[in-house]
Amino acid sequence: MYGKVETDGTETERTVSGVTSETTNASKSENYIGGSVFAETEYAGFTLGLDVVPFKIKLGDGKRTDTTSDANESTQEDGTVSAEASLDYLTTIYAHYPIGDWYAGLGYHMTKVTTDEKLHTSSYGNQDINGLQYAIGKNSGSLRYELSYSDFDDISLTSSNGDKITADADNLMFKLSYVYGQ
C-alpha cells in the first residue's frame, strides 16, 4: 500500500496571567508505504472483510523554539518543544459490492491517535477515533487493485495544563493485494 495522509490542525494555548491565548495553525502531509493483513468471506453477493495495518501511520511532527520577552513573567516557558502524532494499528471492517471484475467498497475504520511530545510543562493524551473509507477496486485473478479515500473523525486533545489541539485527518491510498485462494 502507498498512501498520503493530510492533517490540518490548530493549537490554542491557554490564557496565562491575563495574556490572551495564542493560536497556531498548521497543515501536514505525510506519505507512507506499508502493508496490511486481511481476512474476508462472501455473503449474499458481498465480500465482507477485516483489515489490520500492524504498524503506525505518521500524521505529522513539528518543532518550535519559544522565547519570552520579559524575564519577570510568571511562566517562563523558553526552549524547544516538539510533538509527533500517529495512527496506531488501523483496523477496518469493510464490504465490497461486485460490479463485474470491479467493486465498490465501504469501510469503517477504528484506530488510536497516539502523541509523543516534549513540552515545557504539560503533555497530551491519546484518543480513539473512527472514520469512513470509500473505495473502488478491480479484481484480476489473485491480484486486487484498490484506490480509497478515508475521512477520519475530528481529533480533539487537551493537555494537562489546558492547551488544546484540534485536527482533521484524511487519507488517500492505493493498495495492491494478493488474495489467497482466488
Question: Which residues are covered by each model-predicted region?
Answer:
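Transmembrane beta-strands of outer-membrane beta-barrel pores
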Residues: 2-6, 43-45, 52-58, 99-101, ...
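Outer-membrane beta-barrel translocator domains and adjoining extracellular loop/strand segments
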Residues: 6-23, 59-72, 109-126, 150-166
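Transmembrane beta-barrel outer-membrane domains
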Residues: 26-34, 82-90, 117, 123-131, ...
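Outer-membrane beta-barrel transmembrane strands
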Residues: 28, 33-40, 51, 94, ...
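Membrane-embedded beta-strands of outer-membrane beta-barrel proteins
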Residues: 35-37, 93-95, 134-136, 145, ...
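Outer-envelope beta-barrel architecture signal
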Residues: 44-46, 91, 100-102, 132, ...
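Helix-adjacent hinge/juxtasegments
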Residues: 68-101
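Outer-membrane beta-barrel "beta-signal"
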Residues: 136-142, 168-182
